Design a protein with these regions (language model features):
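Conserved glycine-rich acetyl-CoA-binding loop
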Residues: 93-111, 120, 131-138, 142-143
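C-terminal "cap" of GNAT-fold acetyltransferases
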Residues: 86-88, 123-126, 130-172
Length: 178
């Protein structure tokens, strides 16, 4: 059974390994300098996740997924973009490595982010994704996230980080949908 929990300091190495394994598939879709920049950004983000909650999925003592949930009001710098203060909580770096996919791990991590954002009284939850992340985009849309073009930014020439937003005034997505 997969358990969803807050990360522990001892999880740090496994979180980096799981995240890089999950995102490695995008290396082939990006020009080498862009992939190097993206990989470096992932590593820098994971080196100090504050003020985000680092949430993990664990199965049989091994991490099989991870996600960051930044609180509303957090100040951040989007890669290649201007510094922003988050109006709503934001999901970042949802990661499930290939060997753990197809088991609902990503959905469970997203459901936990939604639960926590609602518990904090947030009116919405946001995230960014890109066209190369089509499987993730379908999951987000099935869970009720809708495009929020006003949140888009460009981390590099020709790349658009697409904003998505989930209003939290709606009922929770039902388990098993999608």
């Amino acid at each position: 059974m997969t358990a969803i929990r807050d990360a522990r300091p001892s999880d740090r190495g496994a979180i980096l390994a799981v995240t890089l394994a999950a995102y490695e598939q995008y290396a082939a879709a990006l020009a080498p300098p862009l992939w190097a920049m993206y990989r470096q950004n992932i590593q820098a983000t994971l080196a100090d996740v504050r003020p985000a909650a680092q949430i993990v999925a664990e199965e049989g003592g091994a991490l099989v997924g991870t996600v960051l949930l930044f609180p509303a009001g957090a100040g951040m710098a989007n890669p290649g973009g201007k510094p922003v203060t988050l109006e709503w909580p934001e999901v970042r770096l949802l990661a499930v490595p290939p060997a753990a996919r197809g088991k609902g791990v990503a959905r469970r991590l997203m459901e936990e982010c939604i639960r926590r954002a609602r518990a904090a009284g947030a009116p919405a939850l946001t995230l960014h994704t890109a066209d190369i992340m089509s499987v993730a985009m379908r999951l987000y849309e099935r869970m009720g996230f809708a495009r929020a073009v006003e949140l888009d930014f460009s981390p590099a020439p020709g790349i658009v980080a697409k904003g998505y937003k989930l209003p939290l005034t709606l009922p929770s997505p039902q388990r098993g949908e999608g």
